């Protein structure tokens, strides 16, 4: 498997999401945070995480509970959902639109991804009379609070896995990408 291929990207993103570390016997990894450090989720904590990683983002003027950013030319939103606003949702939109005549084909590609992977959830949504958007999202439940590292990992996992899906979609469609957005 060569770097850059879809399975490789998914494997790398999974390792990144899970923060896999290899240690020798009788050796432990250093834990910077402890369970005592759980703090309630807030949009400010999401902003702090994005800032810590040097990611540029903007606050949505129309929706003050949403942060927006671009990664690899894909649009992303970060928001807190749920009754207690404790579920962090990272949602990305593919940078192409699809004619409604290709709906079944694109839904099949999304369903194939969803059947073979735990995350992110991917789907197709009608955006106008004749155009569809393709989305990927990952939700992390932090209703009991979270460590900074958990927030950081949830954002990194959401970004890397959604982008892996978009790249997989582009690879599958190949030359047909030129026909989109027309």
Give the ranges of each region predicted by the language model.
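Short, highly charged C-terminal tails/helix-capping segments
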Residues: 170-182
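Glycine-rich, aromatic-bearing surface loops/beta-hairpins
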Residues: 157-164
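Short, ordered beta-strand-loop transition motifs
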Residues: 58-63, 82-84, 125-132
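Charge-rich, low-complexity N-terminal segments
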Residues: 2-81
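Short, internal acidic amphipathic alpha-helical interface segments
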Residues: 92-137
